[in-house]
């Protein structure tokens, strides 16, 4: 179809921003914009038809919104209106000069009636989008596991680089976000971990009391685990002495009294040490301790009181010894009501149940 119709190239010199060609071919509707070449000039090639050899092809240019005729073409004035025109001879002259090559865009647009020629440029501009690369630094709290964005940096990529290729290079982000992500640990959690570790190595017993719960005595102070170790060792000594006495079959009164004093001294030393651990700044009077022993409902304490009374009725001389023994037994704190069973449970035990020192005392009284 294009080869059968004669073609003509319309031109306009550089200078304007936009030019539209209109004429009898589109009923003067201004539907054919001209193409701007690299030099800045405008041109367009389209097929033209003539009804007869003497007929004319009328056209006009719309330059930046103004309807203007061109001085390079013939001008026809009709009722004061100037229009350009060409004849069949002009088409033949241009063909002989070899300048009647058809621009594909213009031919297509002439057939489609008002298809904009600037559409390819608009698509080209739309493809040239700016690309950015986001670098994030994620801070992780070791205690709670919470992750937060510590810093974020946005870098514009050149046109040659592709954002998807950059993401593939860095691999999958740990936070599931696009861009490059760096994860750092929370320094606060690390410092706390380093501070706790040497404390646990130097104080293993404090760790044991923490896990099982704190033990409070009647005075409201926390008992340490060392006091329990001392008292358990005293009970073991009493059991060993009891076994030795049973092997001997009951010795003289002087030997039993000496054993009683020895066991009493052995019990005094750990109890005094345990008292230092419990409340070293306070010294409890003996009178208050004896009254506390009488008021408690623990059976071993009541037994001590009855035995000391029988001892005082039979022999009046050793009253001081009875008070001393009663004070020693009363220093052991009774188990307060409502407290849970704790690692220092052995503190509440009384060796009188096993028949230790007080069994020997009963033999002396007989």
From Swiss-Prot:
It is found in: Cell membrane. The modification Phosphothreonine is found at residue 216. Keywords: Cell membrane, Isopeptide bond, Membrane, Phosphoprotein, Ubl conjugation. Disulfide bonds: none annotated. GO terms for biological process: signal transduction. Residues 159-180, 217-366 are annotated as: Disordered. It holds the Pfam family AMPK1_CBM. The modification Phosphoserine is found at residues 160, 288. Its main location: membrane. It is a peripheral membrane protein. One of its GO terms (molecular function) is protein kinase binding. InterPro entries: AMPK1_CBM, CRP1_MDG1_kinase, Ig-like_fold, Ig_E-set. Residues 265-284 have a biased composition (Basic and acidic residues). SUPFAM superfamilies: E set domains. It comes from the Eukaryota. CDD domains: E_set_AMPKbeta_like_N. One of its GO terms (cellular component) is plasma membrane. Residues 233-247 have a biased composition (Acidic residues). There is a cross-link at residue 314 (Glycyl lysine isopeptide (Lys-Gly) (interchain with G-Cter in ubiquitin)). Involved in G-protein mediated signal transduction and in the regulation of polarized cell growth in pheromone-induced cells. Belongs to the CRP1/MDG1 family. This is Signal transduction protein MDG1. It comes from Saccharomyces cerevisiae (strain RM11-1a).
